[in-house]
Amino acid sequence: MKTFLNIVLFLVLPLVAHAQDITQTLRGTIYDQSTHEPLIGATVVVQNSQPIIGTTTDEAGNFSITNLPLGRVSLEISYIGYESRVIPEVLITSAKEVVLSIALKEAATELEGVEVVAGIRKEKALNAMATVSARTFSVEETQRYAGGLNDPARLASAFAGVSTGNLQDNSIVVRGNAPQGVQWRLEGVEIPSPQHFSGGNVIGGGLVTLFSNQVIGNSDFLTGAFPAEYGNALAAVFDVKMRTGNTSRYEHTAQVGVLGLDFASEGPLSRAKGSSYLFNYRYSTLGLLSDLKINKTGQRIKYQDLSFKLNFPTEKAGTFSLWGIGGIDNTHKDALSVPADWKTDIDRVNNNWETYVGTVGLRHQITAGERSFVESHLAFSGTDDRISTDYLSDDASVFSPDSRLKKQNGTLTLATSLTHKLSPLATLKVGLTSKQLFYKYNLSAAQDYVPSTYARIVNSAGSTNLTEGYAQLKYQLSPALLANVGLRAHYFGLSKELSLESRAGLAWKLSDKHSLSFGYGKHSQPEDLNVYMIEVGGVAVNKDLKLSEAHHFVLGYDWMLTDKLRFKAEAYYQYLWNIPGEEGTSYSLINLRRALYLNKALVNNTKGRNYGIDLTLERFLGDNYYYLITGSIFKSEYKAGDNVWRNTRYNKGFVLNALFGKEFYFANNRKVLDVNARVSVTGGERYSPILESQSVAQKRVIYDESSAFSEQFHTLTYADLTVNYRINHRKSSSVFSFQMKNVLGAPIYIDHNYNYQTGQIELSKATLVIPNISYKIEF
């Protein structure tokens, strides 16, 4: 027995020692929030470390802490005259260094030598001028939150005021607004909706976000009353930041899963100059299944994308970064060749869709003196959609063209902004953006699959311009009262329209635990350019459409119950006007779901109103667990050309989400299991009553538009699950992931269709379960 124990100890003790030897480096840069000036001598301490682990920043604001054990650590950063900041629950793994970029806010006091300690404010946005309806999200949350599927858009559906447009895609409905009102910005530049198969099911949504979460850093999501720097959005803004590649060593990630192959790499281009690269490439495994003839559904889906960022700091000329994203999509479906197999019209249609989308940008950042910071952008975005559909005759002998679409859009953007710290209490930001918009749009289509109606709808090409300017002032009126005021000017060349938009925000800290906030904004948004190009009788009938506009009012209350638990309530009212609609009918773009085949003459005749309350109870990650409970009650109504107030399509009434996650650590933190679950309950979308007898007679769905959106689909209840298991090796990490959306198989309600086999109009529903099993290695 003694011999046996000696053998076991001989084998086990080296493994234990090996585990204890695995450590990692945490590095970063600390700078002034307004001017981006590096803060020299700032103190960085690992909370609750014994003995104390910490360091100070050098002349470039950089710091490095080596030999940190695996697991999670919280950092406290302090600097005289600035508010201290806590960075909570930073994950330390064996494969990759942790590199942080940390901004500190100058304290609202001018007393020399005073150090102000701020609590953990994870719920606040990165943008210091966002007073209400804004929060930050991290790349780790997209991986951890159940239902996120590594996608920022799906992650956001867990936040208060947000619901999924449909489980089939990642579109989101924010406070009753159509998904088309959501804007995406990348590296400070507005970009086209970055989705694979964007707008195929719902405009503003797609299958999955175009860029991998391997390349994004902490980013902001705003849902109302935006600061003045944000324009061209009525619903929400994703302000996404890309990470900067590691400047000291090379690191790589490879992942294979049900949904795709993913490879990322980063590292120094020049260690001496601090330049670096970061890139990521993905290829859809669904495409591989099609190539191998494993996918038997008849729908062949392929997509791939590339993201990159090159960063070049200089000694005196500031920092230059070249970045870009691009994607290629293709989906093809063959019609069923036997008429007896047809259930709906889609079964007798051949469909092919190719999409090319990309953005490339050059950013320059430089400090100007001790109080100013200048950021400039030059970027080009482009999209190219090519769709063809053919309709099989009743006897399955002849295909007739149903639609031919070629849609190309391009945007050349030149932008610059100046942030100037007037004093420790006041910061001014001004900016100017000029965009040249290019378009080429050719569409011919039949109406309701009737070949004899096939005709040209649009054939137009040209360009126009969009010019925007803004000024935003942040002023600390007192230690407890912060004001943000701004003005934005917006000129759209196509309609020759100038819009002046005021913005305001007020945050009042009642005590260390309680605060009130108020926000107001006037906002505007042009339509997709193809809407302006629609022809009726050979005449472009929509070129004089004005900008759609809205007033946003938000009143918020925050209660920090503990340093990790907060309650937040926001009441809001939005009034919309000048939304395009059809004269004399209930039709309006406020309910728009798809826009590729839009062919109506429109006028700015629609008004809308959204109002409700959003509630959040959030327990931030700590002690190895977190939870998030959000609820919203709201109404969304509109009045179009028939002058009747009605429900909008997106007046779901309510949405409720509950998320929970727990981490389990084993083997001296070398192995980590995290389990995450989500349950969501949301009201169904609205739809119009169906004229049954007319629909059956014409073998297509005909809606009663005089009672538009008076009916509602059933309440949707679904659950999501995410399980990750990480193994930290000495120089690499392995991560096994199981993600499943709609794990209980709840049916989703899609639309109504005429069924050839039953001769009836039937509700189209599906049980859509989205699994993603993957293996990732970091090295």
Residue positions per predicted region:
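Periplasm-facing N-terminal accessory domains of Gram-negative outer-membrane beta-barrel systems
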Residues: 18-113, 119, 480
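Periplasmic N-terminal accessory/gating domains of Gram-negative outer-membrane beta-barrel systems
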Residues: 83, 91-92, 115-226, 237, ...
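Surface-exposed extracellular loop regions of Gram-negative outer-membrane beta-barrel proteins
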Residues: 190, 195, 201, 337-339, ...
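Transmembrane beta-barrel wall of Gram-negative outer-membrane proteins
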Residues: 257-283, 296-332, 352-376, 380, ...
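Outer membrane beta-barrel strand-and-loop segments of large Gram-negative receptors
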Residues: 407, 411-415, 457-468, 545-546, ...
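Structural signature of Gram-negative outer-membrane beta-barrels, strongest in the C-terminal barrel
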Residues: 409, 423-427, 433, 458-577, ...
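Gram-negative outer-membrane beta-barrel transporters
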Residues: 476-478, 575, 597-685
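C-terminal beta-signal and adjacent terminal beta-strands/loops
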Residues: 627, 680-700, 714-720, 725-779
